[in-house]
């Protein structure tokens, strides 16, 4: 009995020690650390020019992709990968270590307590949250609210970080940020200065904007990337069934990049999605709809949220799919100050 208690105490002490050590570790290791491992500075610069700024990000690329970088031979890539493996651990870890790692995940408030409760605290980092629904259901309004709440300190359920916003539909309104910032007692000018914004016009432009984010996120404390919407440009640039396979392949590459950004820099990715008619939705559902993007998008999103219009000016958010959340729903309201709890 005593031996069992001592073993349990020892185990708990080890967990505490590992947790304390883990807090001291950086979220990612900069790519220039490869130089200390014997990698030529010129080769490190080539990696940076290709959009790879951390050793963590390097390990998320295939050797085939790396040899596609001008000036990097197969032998050089092998040497670079071996050096990176000495700096970052991309192998197995125990379940306890995985639990400790999960503690670095930040939950960003949506501005609505009911919605936060539904999501287990808010929009989480190191994950992709997809919000889909018809127009005027509140997806973009939540995006604008998150632009502000992400910058709140962590003791106010914020992310204490900057915001990156990629707009594919031309719906971002900086003047909308002002009353939301005022609601949370923040300086609107400072809030806007902490948002980097880009308007994408083609799916290629959208992908290139993602590639350029790595350099910024490795230098500054970003906490969320918003893409509004993920599918719009693909539906415009690829038309007809003949281009569907190519579209889905390009979409998969885009989503893979988003997953890597989320995990590499511990940022939340919030992306909106459109809906399409669902002919197989059933005769008992009026006007059945499903999210656009097919299985490719469905498998990439960590958390999928269905937004719909409720009674009057209320909106409803339902957990459509999530690994750790119950299938439930919550009501919210769109106010001058952003997303808020619905009035009874």
Curated annotation (Swiss-Prot):
Sites binding dsDNA sit at 235, 241, 247
What do we know about how this protein assembles, alone or with others?
Double stacked ring-shaped homooctamer. Interacts with BRCA2A and BRCA2B.
Q: The organism sits in which domain of life?
A: Eukaryota
Please report the name of this protein according to its UniProt entry.
Answer: Meiotic recombination protein DMC1 homolog
Extract one GO cellular component term from the record. Answer: nucleus
Disruption outcome = Strongly reduced fertility and seed numbers due to defects in male and female gametogenesis.
Annotated GO molecular function terms are:
ATP binding; ATP hydrolysis activity; ATP-dependent DNA damage sensor activity; DNA binding; DNA strand exchange activity
The record's Gene3D superfamilies line, in alphabetical order, gives: 5' to 3' exonuclease, C-terminal subdomain, P-loop containing nucleotide triphosphate hydrolases
Compartments, record wording: Nucleus
What does the function comment of this entry state?
May participate in meiotic recombination, specifically in homologous strand assimilation, which is required for the resolution of meiotic double-strand breaks. Mediates interhomolog recombination during meiosis.
Give the residues the record marks as binding ATP.
133-140
Q: Region annotation Disordered: residue ranges?
A: 1-22
Q: In which tissues is it expressed?
A: Expressed in mitotic and/or meiotic tissues. Expressed in roots, leaves and anthers and carpels of young fower buds.
Gene name per UniProt: DMC1
Q: Which family does it belong to?
A: Belongs to the RecA family. DMC1 subfamily.
State the UniProt keywords alphabetically: ATP-binding, Cell cycle, DNA-binding, Meiosis, Nucleotide-binding, Nucleus
Q: Which PROSITE patterns match?
A: RECA_2 (PS50162), RECA_3 (PS50163)
| Chain residues that bind ssDNA | 235, 238, 241, 247, 315
A GO biological process of this protein is: DNA repair
């Amino acid at each position: 009995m005593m031996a069992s208690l001592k073993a349990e105490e020892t185990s708990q002490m080890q967990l505490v020690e590992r947790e304390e050590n883990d807090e001291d570790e950086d979220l990612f290791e900069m790519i220039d650390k490869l130089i200390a491992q014997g990698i030529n500075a010129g080769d490190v610069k080539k990696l940076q020019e290709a959009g790879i700024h951390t050793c963590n990000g390097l390990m998320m690329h295939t050797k085939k992709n790396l040899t596609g970088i001008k000036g990097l031979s197969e032998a050089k890539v092998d040497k670079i990968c071996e050096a990176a493996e000495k700096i970052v651990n991309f192998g197995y870890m125990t379940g306890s270590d995985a639990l400790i790692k999960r503690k670095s995940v930040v939950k960003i408030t949506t501005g609505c307590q009911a919605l936060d409760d539904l999501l287990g605290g808010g929009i989480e980092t190191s994950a992709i949250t997809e919000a889909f629904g018809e127009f005027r259901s509140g997806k973009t309004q939540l995006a604008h609210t998150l632009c502000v709440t992400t910058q709140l300190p962590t003791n106010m359920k914020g992310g204490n970080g900057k915001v990156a916003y990629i707009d594919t539909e031309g719906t971002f309104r900086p003047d909308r940020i002002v009353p939301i910032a005022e609601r949370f007692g923040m300086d609107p000018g400072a809030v806007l200065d902490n948002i980097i914004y880009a308007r994408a016009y083609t799916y290629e432009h959208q992908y290139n904007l993602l590639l350029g984010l790595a350099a910024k996120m490795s230098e500054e404390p970003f906490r969320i990337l918003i893409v509004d919407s993920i599918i719009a440009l693909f539906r415009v640039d690829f038309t007809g069934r003949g281009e569907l396979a190519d579209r889905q392949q390009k979409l998969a590459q885009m989503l893979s990049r988003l997953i890597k950004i989320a995990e590499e820099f511990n940022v939340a990715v919030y992306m909106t999605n459109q809906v399409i008619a669902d002919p197989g939705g059933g005769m008992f559902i009026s006007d059945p709809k499903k999210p656009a993007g097919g299985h490719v998008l469905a498998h990439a999103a960590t958390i999928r949220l269905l937004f719909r219009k409720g009674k009057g000016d209320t909106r409803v958010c339902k957990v459509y799919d999530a690994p750790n959340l119950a299938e439930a729903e919550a009501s919210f309201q769109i106010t001058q100050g952003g997303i808020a709890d619905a009035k009874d």
